[in-house]
A protein has these predicted regions:
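Structured alpha-helical segments in the cores of large, soluble enzyme domains
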Residues: 218-228
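Acidic/aromatic-lined carbohydrate-recognition and catalytic surfaces
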Residues: 1-203, 211, 229
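Glycine-rich phosphate-binding "P-loop"
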Residues: 207-218
Length: 229
């Protein structure tokens, strides 16, 4: 195929983003891991093989990358660590988050405007599932999964916790609501993003959070994989 492109007069092969994107991505711009070539595209070995073949036919490779943002998605481990540990996360300042915004409710927190409606209304529909183990816990609410801050839930056995946070009861819903208030993020309706969001997005897309790529530590981490072939 590369030989055909060379005969047609092409000088380069253009590749859309090749690092790991969220599952089901059709374009690769919603990156969840900048440090690896996507296994779905063949991984590092496939890229090296393509580079060798292209070079043997006099072709270069033009690689499209997106170092300025990532997907705000559960598959993004940097993002998940920020949600779980807040300012204590080593990645807290890798994303362009305003940790001290004008809103007192968001100071030291990240707005998570990913819900279809308010938390209260969602709890009434019982769209909540909790996952606990000895060290970590997560909550599934309205189809999204969010990590819980360590120590933000009572020291009970998993079965007891499920009963304690049973959203079929008013007490259970109140407890889940209070649990969410203790987190390093504030879950909210997507409608809140326009006025209240405290982190830089890619344009107005709340699924894509900006990186502080101008900071050397972030730059080096992102470019670890995006090196010349």
């Amino acid at each position: 195929m590369q030989n055909l492109f060379a005969k047609m007069g092409f000088s380069h092969l253009y590749l859309s983003p090749i690092t790991c994107a969220r599952e089901g991505s059709t374009h690769g711009y919603d990156v969840v891991d900048h440090t690896k070539v996507s296994p779905q595209l063949g991984g590092e070995s496939a890229l090296e093989d393509l580079s060798r073949q292209a070079r043997s036919h006099g072709l270069g490779i033009l690689l499209d990358i997106v170092p300025n943002h990532m997907a705000a998605h559960p598959e993004n481990l940097w993002w998940q660590d920020v949600l779980r540990h807040g300012l204590e996360s080593p990645y807290a300042h890798w994303f362009d988050i305003d940790w001290q915004p004008a809103s007192r409710a968001l100071q030291g927190k990240v707005l998570a405007p990913f819900l279809s409606s308010s938390v209260r209304s969602i709890l009434l529909r019982e769209e909540v599932e909790l996952f606990f183990n000895d060290a970590q816990a997560s909550i599934r609410i309205a189809g999204g999964v969010y990590p819980l801050k360590p120590g933000s839930w009572p020291a009970l056995q998993p079965a007891q916790l499920m009963s304690y946070y049973d959203t079929a009861t008013q007490n259970g819903r109140d407890r889940v609501h209070e649990l969410l208030r203790r987190q390093n993020y504030r879950l909210a309706s997507w409608r809140c993003a326009a006025k209240s969001i405290n982190w830089r997005r890619f344009f107005d897309i709340s699924d894509l959070i900006a990186l502080r790529i101008q900071d050397r530590e972030v730059f080096d981490a992102v470019w670890a994989e995006d090196r010349p072939c």
